[in-house]
């Protein structure tokens, strides 16, 4: 029997689901328990294929627009995704007489309120974010067309010409890189000294915490694996942060079977984290895949303990959600005990 080579896996904490993602998934599951299938969900509830497929198996039906819901099912509940939606979406739901449950992350809702506050004070709103991201579409859709300008890059910030440079306020997409945001803000604040910040930090606590955990584990890592989907903004940022802070290579994977072990080369230290929409059960799966090939020692790299939780919608608070209901995403193994 061959002897397995030793391997240290640095397991980042915090990692994976944030309170907003956890709440959104719970809302879909609770709606299924209370109202029965099907429950419609506008857009992916979170950007993770495994989560979406798991909810589909339990009776959720995902649509991109409300008019995709058949008329005979318009008495069934519809859930809005964690990313938030433009104001036009609940207005359309009201026109269709749909019963909807809003799973928008409370921190995204806070950004919406900050944008509206800027407008009430007569300011044009600058949104720092990525075009086409559902959260950006939702935030821009809180105000009338033309009231928000999207700034994606430092180049955008350098060339932006407002109508009134003394009447500007900004908000940011919650899942942006802290460093990327800082560079854009530095340009904007130098060009427009009167630029008004939001009353509270727009970048989500979980985004910052996961980036800090990756920074702490990156140096000395032969490989840094980030569990997440290609369309997950916060997961892609973690890959960038890992490389920027010293990992020899950093890879985004959705499942263990995407890892090409034959091409990884010699490994002594592998660091492992997960984006805010990536389930813990995939972290378990990846560790198991490494255990089949290496003599693995787990080292927990913890930077902060997260205690945040968000209440689900009032209509669902009388429904009991069991650990078994969430087992398809949370997993059952030893890594779960290491996650805060």
Swiss-Prot record:
Catalytic activity: isopentenyl diphosphate + 2 oxidized [2Fe-2S]-[ferredoxin] + H2O = (2E)-4-hydroxy-3-methylbut-2-enyl diphosphate + 2 reduced [2Fe-2S]-[ferredoxin] + 2 H(+); dimethylallyl diphosphate + 2 oxidized [2Fe-2S]-[ferredoxin] + H2O = (2E)-4-hydroxy-3-methylbut-2-enyl diphosphate + 2 reduced [2Fe-2S]-[ferredoxin] + 2 H(+)
Active site: 135 (proton donor)
Keywords recorded for this protein, A-Z: 4Fe-4S, Iron, Iron-sulfur, Isoprene biosynthesis, Metal-binding, Oxidoreductase
InterPro entries: LytB/IspH
Presence of keyword Iron-sulfur: yes
Cofactor(s) for this UniProt protein: [4Fe-4S] cluster
Binding-site positions, dimethylallyl diphosphate: 47, 83, 133, 232-234, 277
UniProt-listed Pfam families: LYTB
UniProt remark on cofactor binding: Binds 1 [4Fe-4S] cluster per subunit.
Pathway note: Isoprenoid biosynthesis; dimethylallyl diphosphate biosynthesis; dimethylallyl diphosphate from (2E)-4-hydroxy-3-methylbutenyl diphosphate: step 1/1; Isoprenoid biosynthesis; isopentenyl diphosphate biosynthesis via DXP pathway; isopentenyl diphosphate from 1-deoxy-D-xylulose 5-phosphate: step 6/6
Role: Catalyzes the conversion of 1-hydroxy-2-methyl-2-(E)-butenyl 4-diphosphate (HMBPP) into a mixture of isopentenyl diphosphate (IPP) and dimethylallyl diphosphate (DMAPP). Acts in the terminal step of the DOXP/MEP pathway for isoprenoid precursor biosynthesis.
Entries under NCBIfam families matching the protein: ispH_lytB, PRK01045.1-4
Family: Belongs to the IspH family.
Listed name of the protein: 4-hydroxy-3-methylbut-2-enyl diphosphate reductase
Source organism phylogeny: Bacteria, Pseudomonadati, Pseudomonadota, Alphaproteobacteria, Hyphomicrobiales
